[in-house]
């Protein structure tokens, strides 16, 4: 997972530790809630910073599964399980941020479950978006809503104009101009 902050304030590739820590801690808390919702007590995850990217200010993040789980999976012949768990959590995170951004603080007016699929259609008036059931359950957690706002808090700093969180398939991008859509 790659997290990139951009803007004129980052031309020297530096960001205040307090700002970065607050944002990453909020992201880690959301990952914890997603993990607990998806896997209950079967695994534990945490974010780790692996590399810093040149250019704007980028951080490569890895969701680390618990060692116990990894050893159990290897011994039981399921070495790809930890990777699949991480992918499920990252996908859930990206859907949560996309839903929060789409809502723009508007109240949900209707929710339809899509038969034979693990998805819901969320309505605000006539507008709609389809999200994964798990992402919607995690999104409803009040702490996740607060953490979404904290995650985008670097956009409150003058000169930081955007942040982007992505995996190999999906990208979530938020600009400073539109940051209020992720506020509580």
Annotate the PLM regions.
Residues 1-184:
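Charged, alpha-helical interface segments at or near domain boundaries
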